[in-house]
């Protein structure tokens, strides 16, 4: 990795130093209880590394999308869970900046950990307000960005603060960038990209950037119908972006010219209305009627995609194959996840968001090489964009 990480620092550069670590503790909480602590667990290696070297660790994160101070979005449950995982107390402060916070930090001993309050309680955070960033920077000697999930945002705690104190990457950030970077720069082949989700427009940047890198695309999810309609198929009442039909044609022609395989579904699970108990049928994509709605890929498509997946050596997957939140429409996503898990010879990378949620629901996390902690950030990384939260860190 071209950016400095905490591993590039000498132990004496950390001992006794105040280190402000941007983590991504944006975890789901129901009635004060964290329902999935994966993001907290992912940050542990960096936090432990700093504790072991005698740093004073000051953690900063957002939670949800608060409008000003909101009691239900305070970080107390997060501090409690982190304390259990670390086996040591984590003091949660009631603010992010100001005298009280500065006083608490001045009383910290080597190896202590504090968690600042939800940084998005301040609108200055998302505005990347320089004065606010300066106040945050004043709390510490060194900045560590370990929040890949927000690295595509230029906010005060993800980018602004590194204008005032030296910034380096944490271990999770390093892992995310190295694994995805290697897949893009020197992949084992065949290299395929599986794309799903509702909209082509969300994935255009990824398709264009990967077109020169991959051997093939497998297209599922709602976006398949925009491509099918562009080819002249009847798609019924399925989700279609009519203003993207020309673009869809252009993408398919680009793939053809470059000799990149562009596989569209052969069949789909079809309903007349989207609801949990809707009667389903399987139809080939050329047999749709005017009132049909496609909600998942069908068995022929699953088999076709499975064959490609088992041959691949590098797989990037972003977006579910159907409306997986409804169990009856989740089979395609499940079978694709199982096929990737079955391929023991491939590097498999999942770009956060819905696909990651689906894999967790199926309990297959440990069968994938890497499940990104960032949905939007991994998409922008795959689009070839430089992420603001990485750009500001020191070069090696």
UniProtKB/Swiss-Prot annotation:
<feature type="binding site">
    <location>
        <begin position="352"/>
        <end position="355"/>
    </location>
    <ligand>
        <name>ATP</name>
    </ligand>
</feature>
<keyword id="KW-0547">Nucleotide-binding</keyword>
<feature type="binding site">
    <location>
        <begin position="62"/>
        <end position="65"/>
    </location>
    <ligand>
        <name>substrate</name>
    </ligand>
</feature>
<keyword id="KW-0324">Glycolysis</keyword>
<dbReference type="GO" id="GO:0043531">
    <property type="term" value="F:ADP binding"/>
</dbReference>
<dbReference type="InterPro" id="IPR015824">
    <property type="entry name" value="Phosphoglycerate_kinase_N"/>
</dbReference>
<feature type="binding site">
    <location>
        <position position="294"/>
    </location>
    <ligand>
        <name>ATP</name>
    </ligand>
</feature>
<feature type="binding site">
    <location>
        <position position="203"/>
    </location>
    <ligand>
        <name>ATP</name>
    </ligand>
</feature>
<dbReference type="GO" id="GO:0006094">
    <property type="term" value="P:gluconeogenesis"/>
</dbReference>
<keyword id="KW-0418">Kinase</keyword>
<keyword id="KW-0067">ATP-binding</keyword>
<comment type="subunit">
    <text>Monomer.</text>
</comment>
<dbReference type="GO" id="GO:0005524">
    <property type="term" value="F:ATP binding"/>
</dbReference>
<feature type="binding site">
    <location>
        <position position="39"/>
    </location>
    <ligand>
        <name>substrate</name>
    </ligand>
</feature>
<comment type="similarity">
    <text>Belongs to the phosphoglycerate kinase family.</text>
</comment>
<keyword id="KW-0808">Transferase</keyword>
<keyword id="KW-0963">Cytoplasm</keyword>
<protein>
    <recommendedName>
        <fullName>Phosphoglycerate kinase</fullName>
        <ecNumber>2.7.2.3</ecNumber>
    </recommendedName>
</protein>
<dbReference type="Pfam" id="PF00162">
    <property type="entry name" value="PGK"/>
</dbReference>
<dbReference type="InterPro" id="IPR015911">
    <property type="entry name" value="Phosphoglycerate_kinase_CS"/>
</dbReference>
<feature type="binding site">
    <location>
        <begin position="24"/>
        <end position="26"/>
    </location>
    <ligand>
        <name>substrate</name>
    </ligand>
</feature>
<dbReference type="InterPro" id="IPR036043">
    <property type="entry name" value="Phosphoglycerate_kinase_sf"/>
</dbReference>
<feature type="binding site">
    <location>
        <position position="325"/>
    </location>
    <ligand>
        <name>ATP</name>
    </ligand>
</feature>
<dbReference type="InterPro" id="IPR001576">
    <property type="entry name" value="Phosphoglycerate_kinase"/>
</dbReference>
<dbReference type="GO" id="GO:0006096">
    <property type="term" value="P:glycolytic process"/>
</dbReference>
<feature type="binding site">
    <location>
        <position position="120"/>
    </location>
    <ligand>
        <name>substrate</name>
    </ligand>
</feature>
<feature type="binding site">
    <location>
        <position position="153"/>
    </location>
    <ligand>
        <name>substrate</name>
    </ligand>
</feature>
<dbReference type="GO" id="GO:0004618">
    <property type="term" value="F:phosphoglycerate kinase activity"/>
</dbReference>
<comment type="pathway">
    <text>Carbohydrate degradation; glycolysis; pyruvate from D-glyceraldehyde 3-phosphate: step 2/5.</text>
</comment>
<dbReference type="GO" id="GO:0005829">
    <property type="term" value="C:cytosol"/>
</dbReference>
């Amino acid at each position: 990795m071209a950016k400095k990480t905490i591993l590039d620092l000498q132990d004496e550069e950390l001992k006794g130093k105040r280190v402000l670590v941007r983590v991504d503790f944006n975890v789901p909480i129901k009635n004060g209880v964290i329902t999935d602590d994966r993001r907290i667990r992912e940050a542990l290696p960096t936090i432990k590394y700093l504790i072991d070297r005698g740093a004073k660790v000051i953690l900063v994160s957002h939670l949800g999308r608060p409008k000003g101070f909101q009691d239900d979005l305070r970080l107390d449950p997060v501090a409690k869970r982190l304390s259990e995982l670390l086996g040591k107390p984590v003091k949660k402060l009631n603010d992010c900046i100001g005298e009280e916070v500065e006083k608490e930090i001045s009383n910290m001993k080597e190896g202590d950990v504090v968690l600042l309050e939800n940084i998005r309680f301040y609108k200055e955070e998302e505005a990347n307000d320089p004065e606010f960033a300066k106040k945050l920077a004043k709390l510490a000697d060194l900045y560590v960005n370990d929040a890949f999930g927000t690295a595509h945002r230029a906010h005060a705690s993800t980018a602004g603060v590194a204008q005032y104190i030296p910034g380096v990457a944490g271990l999770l950030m390093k892992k995310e960038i190295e694994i995805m970077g290697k897949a893009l720069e020197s992949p084992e082949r065949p290299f395929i990209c599986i794309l799903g989700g509702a909209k082509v427009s969300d994935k255009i940047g990824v398709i264009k950037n990967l077109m020169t890198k991959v051997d093939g695309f497998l297209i599922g999810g709602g976006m398949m119908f925009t491509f099918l309609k562009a080819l002249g198929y009847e798609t019924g009442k399925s989700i279609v972006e009519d203003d993207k039909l020309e673009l869809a044609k252009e993408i398919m022609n680009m793939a053809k010219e470059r000799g990149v395989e562009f596989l569209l579904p052969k069949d789909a699970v079809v309903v007349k209305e989207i609801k949990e108990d809707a009667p389903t049928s399987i139809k080939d994509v050329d047999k749709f009627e005017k009132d049909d709605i496609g909600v998942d890929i069908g068995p022929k498509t699953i088999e076709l995609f499975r064959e490609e997946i088992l041959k691949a050596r590098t797989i990037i997957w972003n977006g579910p194959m159907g409306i997986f939140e409804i169990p009856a429409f989740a089979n395609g996503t499940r079978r694709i996840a199982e096929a990737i898990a079955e391929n023991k010879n491939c590097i498999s990378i999942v770009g956060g968001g819905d696909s990651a949620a689906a894999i967790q629901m199926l309990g297959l996390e440990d069968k994938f090489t890497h499940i990104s902690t960032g949905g939007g950030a991994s998409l922008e990384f795959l689009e070839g964009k430089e992420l603001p939260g990485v750009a500001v860190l020191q070069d090696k």
